[in-house]
A protein has these predicted regions:
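SDR active-site lid
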Residues: 165-235
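Residue(s) in the substrate-gating loop at a strand-loop-helix junction
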Residues: 132
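Active-site helix of classical SDR
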Residues: 112, 148
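The beta1-alpha1 cofactor-binding region of Rossmann-like NAD(H)/NADP(H)-dependent oxidoreductases
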Residues: 57-68, 94
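Conserved glycine-rich Rossmann-like NAD(P)H-binding loop of the short-chain dehydrogenase/reductase
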Residues: 25-41
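Substrate-binding pocket helix/loop in short-chain dehydrogenase/reductase
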Residues: 88-89, 96-98
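Conserved glycine-rich cofactor-binding loop
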Residues: 11-13
């Protein structure tokens, strides 16, 4: 059965791919983009693909944009919009930290609250929090970003428990290291302020972390997972993709319980 689905952050990456894929399958898709020029760009892509999309400006940190979004009756909300600020936790400017939380946590939660009210009143709906593998483990030099995703995991767990019996499903989607350009753009954010000569970080530690972005995975398997999650009834709460990343996360989580003073926590995630 066709559903009404809102995908935030639909201008690029997973959001764009998921919005187009769902529309191709006959769903009514509202594609939220951050700024007006992205409307024209996405409209052209959708037209070329022969796919009907309702595209609207939805900067999730903007109250006016959120209120306009609430005018849509939505069966599935896919909270995909997000940004990544990177850099050593001991050195990253606090303004960057606040900016990352403003979008990934506060904007996402504000949008979710409005649609949760709509869904509970109707007695049905699904809320999907896109939290990343970084919501379950912590990546060096992406600690602030991972903190925002850990926060979304906590909010999703609480929301699921609190909305029990209302007919509203809550689940998470946790992508591994996929080549959408998002990780690369995030890695570049620290270069605007980071000074290696005066850093607390040893160069070899930084270089080892940057190497983890090599050979990223093909995004299609994650887009397929988003489509499955949106369409199915009774989704699993947590959806880590691919399976190899899920197994790696379990190993990292188990290891943290036994880590000693001189032991390393981090190991590189599975890539392509």
């Amino acid at each position: 059965m066709a559903k009404r689905i809102l995908v935030t952050g639909a201008a690029t990456g997973f959001g764009r791919g998921t919005a187009l894929a769902l529309a191709k399958r006959g769903h009514t898709v509202i594609a939220g983009v951050q700024i007006a020029p992205q409307v024209t760009e996405l409209m052209k892509i959708a037209d070329e693909a022969g796919v009907p999309l309702k595209i609207q400006v939805l900067d999730i940190t903007d109250e006016g944009d959120r209120q306009a979004a609430f005018a849509n009756e939505v069966d599935v909300l896919i909270n995909n919009a997000g940004v990544m600020q990177t850099g050593p936790v001991a050195e990253i400017p606090m303004e960057n930290v606040r900016r990352n939380f403003e979008t990934n946590v506060f904007g996402t939660l504000a949008l979710t609250q409005g649609f949760a009210r709509q869904m509970v009143k109707r007695g049905s709906g699904k809320i999907v929090m896109v939290t990343s593998m970084g919501g379950l483990i912590t990546v060096p030099f992406a600690g602030v970003y991972c903190a925002t995703k850990h926060a979304l995991e906590a909010l999703a767990e609480a929301l699921k428990a609190e909305l029990a019996g209302t007919g509203v499903e809550v689940c998470t989607a946790n992508p591994g290291v996929y080549g959408t350009g998002f990780n690369d753009r995030g890695a570049e954010t620290m270069m605007r302020w980071f000074d290696m000569a005066n850093s607390l970080t040893k160069p070899e530690v930084l270089m080892a972390a940057v190497g983890g972005l090599a050979n990223q995975l093909d995004p299609q398997s994650m887009i397929d997972a988003f489509v499955r999650i949106a369409e199915e009834d009774g989704s699993k709460f947590r959806n880590v993709v691919p399976d190899e990343t899920a197994e790696w996360i379990r190993g990292v989580q188990a290891k943290t319980w036994e880590v000693g003073k001189d032991d390393a926590i981090w190991s590189s995630p599975p890539t392509g």
